[in-house]
Amino acid sequence: VDAPADMVIKAPAGAKVTKAPVAFSHKGHASMDCKTCHHKWDGAGAIQPCQASGCHANTESKKGDDSFYMAFHERKSEKSCVGCHKSMKKGPTKCTECHPKN
């Protein structure tokens, strides 16, 4: 899979932004299966962004499976950044560890 080595995850257009964007390293996560995070990917086609319709398109709520916020912050799901980092006891789990203060 051809993924950008490093990228910045930003809130989708129209979302209420309260924290800084997050620097993300695909390279640093290369040992993981892509489907861990991109759970709707079929393994062959183009990978859609998290906020794609039918996935985490809800930018209004911080609750629910379709919530853009919960895609990254759900502590009880290993599919989210925070949940995976907590489960593995590795990686950032606090707000400012991912969202630098301006």
UniProtKB/Swiss-Prot annotation:
Heme c 2 binds at H39, C50, C55, H56. It comes from the Bacteria. GO terms for cellular component: periplasmic space. The keyword Magnesium does not apply. Its main location: periplasm. Heme c 3 binds at H29, C81, C84, H85. Heme c 1 binds at H26, C34, C37, H38. Keywords: Electron transport, Heme, Iron, Metal-binding, Periplasm, Sulfate respiration, Transport. GO terms for biological process: anaerobic respiration. Heme c 4 binds at H73, C95, C98, H99. GO terms for molecular function: electron transfer activity; heme binding; metal ion binding. Signal peptide: none annotated. Pfam families: Cytochrom_CIII. It is found in: Periplasm. Binds 4 heme c groups covalently per monomer. Its cofactor is heme. Participates in sulfate respiration coupled with phosphorylation by transferring electrons from the enzyme dehydrogenase to ferredoxin. The second heme binding site has an unusual CXXXXCH motif. This is Cytochrome c3.
